[in-house]
Amino acid sequence: MPSQRPRSRRSDNPAIRAEPRGIGTARARDPLAREVKLLGALLGQVIVEQAGLAALELVERVRKSTIAIRRHGPGSAAGRSQRERLTAELDAIGLPEAEVLIRAFSLYFQLTNLAEEKQRIRALRQRLRTGARGAVDESVVAAVLGMRRRGVRGEEADRLMRGLSIAPVLTAHPTEARRRTTLVALRRVYRLLDRLDDPRLTPAEDAHARRRLREEITLLWHTSPIRVVAPGPLDEVRSAMAIFDETLFVVTPRLYRALEQARLQSAGGEPTREGAVPPRTHAYLHWGSWIGGDRDGNPNVTAATTRQALHIQADHVLRAYEAVCRRLMETFSVRAPEDGALAERLAADAAELPHTARELDRRFPGEPFRRRLGYIAERIRRTRLRLTSAEAPPAEAIVGGYPTPFALSAALDELAEQMSTAGLDRAVYGELQSLRWQLETFGFHGLSLEVRQHSEVHSAALAGRDPTGDTLETFRAIAEIQRRFGEAALHRYVISFTRSAADAVAVLELARRAAGSAVPALDVVPLFESADALESCGQIVEELLTEPSYRAHLERRGRRQEVMLGYSDSTKESGALAAAWMLYRAQEQLIEVCRRHGVELALFHGRGGALGRGGGPMTRAILAQAPGSVDGRLKLTEQGEVIADRYANPAIALRHLEQLTYAVLQASTPAHEEQLRAAAAGGRQVLDELAKNARSAYRALVWENPGFEEHFRRATPISELSGMGIGSRPAARSGRAQAPELDALRAIPWVFAWSQSRANLPGWYGTGSALAEYRRRHRGSGLRRLRELYRSWPFFASALDNAELVLARADMAIAERYASLAGETGRPIWESIQTEYERTVEQILDLTGRKRLLDDMPVLQRSIELRNPYVDSLSEMQVLLLGRVRRMPDDDPQRRELLRLVHLTVSGVAAGLQSTG
């Protein structure tokens, strides 16, 4: 299946690709190309074995046809003729052949995505090997060096470092199209590819790795990529904790150590001293989660769910601590005198844990630190039994555990002091320090769970309309969780669709009613997401900060107010450019209001993974925030559809976290903030005008055109997406489950549907009209002014660069195929979309001075060009299947099977585009 043929032995049949010769990939001139060729060849072998040679020949014909269409040009006579032949062939095949075709291209993308992931890591390691680490862009070393270049040194640098706080919050999105089973299988394939990178590989080992790859690809061929049953909230919790086990727990101390080493080098210290002296870097990551706590529009999340979510998290984190202690117990094999405080501690441990004492005394006589770690591990085990038991804990768990994380921290501090006295500073500030950092970060709860609920639910509960009683029970659950796991386990309550100060006060009143004297410690977080709410958020927070009961509550909480800004719904309502400017102005309002009232503002950015929901390159987005909005702190959602991409691989996770650290530190320097203020002062009127016109153009199509909703329903697979069972949350907050009304439809499926149709409309529509109108009104000076702003203002550059990315990933020729499903009645709407696309591309190219989209990002540009023909194959199949299934009566016996194939194409297109919603 690969697009480039290797120079190697061939089969007599040209459809069967030969495997690359040689051993492994370590010495290949182009290891990525070699891996893609190998995976394509192995997949071809599996297709022949499992479906026959005719199936592979069909796949090859379709692949060559889509490539030919691209080569000729979709609008050319040759391209149209080629497409007609392809459509006729696809329309004639039976359902079994269609499934083989869909599976072949889908699995090809899953495999090549792994190869590209490996190449990212390979390239990063190469940069680290060939130059000073500070030369790597957006690393923590670059962050520290950048601060020095910007004049942030000495006490000012230390102050910024002490206040550094980054809080990624994991969410369970219904747009992670891949099953957990598939993700785990792909990790196995990745490890086998990694094995082939070993330069010491022998021919026998190479053959073994290839055999195992064939085996895994065969298993993937027979594994359904879509779920038969939608996952429940606790399934999503367990998936998140698998990421915790494999990546977050391991990578977190590595990040701290990387920053510690960078600070030491920057201060002129000897690099070898890192790990031998007390670290200055604190645990600045504050991991959060909405998984099991977000009940906005999700009736499957209840108070019981939230309780169970914390139990699952605690079980994972305490098992992780215990495993580390048992591992260190095996390595800290030091003979040392047992006297003083150490002897007293060992005697106390033995008296309280006599069974453990007998085993440790037998195994480790004269090795006090191994025995000490053995006791700590046993106490952690008992702590886990006590905290995670649904019923009464076992008798052994009642005594001997740690009552709080602080008690375990004190035990580790005591051990560190005793080991340091024995001359073991390297061990104290090495592996033991990593455990102390992990404990400081994760406590006994793992991820800090947050509750989110719609403001209308609170109003109804206050009025006595809480039919299940779950609203009040949620507050009781929060109080219980805090008693059991500590306040850090759950203390934030997010109010979606906040419209007034009363919405925040209502949460405190409900907590008082539910818990009585045991009111939980809560930080109330208003979420502003609609255009009206973003415009008035400053006034709402002003009223909130002057409301007597709430102000008293805020004083008790340390005069710190967190506010969340929603990127997804604001973009769906107003379009990408207008929403970006609304969010920027909202930040400015909130900064000013909180400054006036002497309250510390903490902003929480509810960014989606997709560009149409506020996603995009994160470093650029952080550097483009309003001046004063970062100040060493960042809190943002890590949406479900990108969690696996960012965190499944520890090396990529570490790189991502280094980039976040870099961006936060750079954005917090006075020089950067001054640059932002100067640029914003000159560009505010321009953005006011652009945003107004962009919003007007977007809303004229999406919200004011009476035929648009029907066109959207026909020209995208939105109705079919709603039945896929991707996540535990319904696609809409209210209304029809299978075909929700547009205003009730969540932003996620909204963007997902447009991504599947290849139009990507939410990320760019309206931008071209706004730019063109500005240039028309301001004539010769308009383009010059826009170019000046693009060069000088990170916010404006980020907004346009994001639009360019979305446009480059869109494909109007394929989108027109989807639009044809809407019939002639939808033609005017499609023509509006196509015209605006062409206008937006033209305006952005004029403004940036580029000849083609992404000319400044040639690697990504080439990747999209290479992938598009393969994605086209799946898109063509999806269009045909959608047409068939929609023409069928609901009771047709074939309808269910056709829908299953549609869902398979959705999964495949998402893999090919590396994007969902």
Locate predicted features.
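Often metal-dependent polyanion-binding catalytic scaffolds in large enzymes
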Residues: 2-470, 522, 615, 702-705, ...
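Hydrophobic cores of alpha-helical transmembrane segments in multi-pass integral membrane proteins
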Residues: 44, 587-597, 838-844, 848
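Catalytic or ion-translocation cores adjacent to nucleophile or general acid/base/metal-coordination motifs
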Residues: 301-332, 514-696
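Active-site cores of enzymes that catalyze phosphoryl transfer or operate on phosphate-rich substrates
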Residues: 371-375, 379-392, 423-424, 429-505, ...
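Flexible, glycine/charged-enriched surface loops at secondary-structure junctions
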Residues: 601, 671-682, 704-712, 849-857
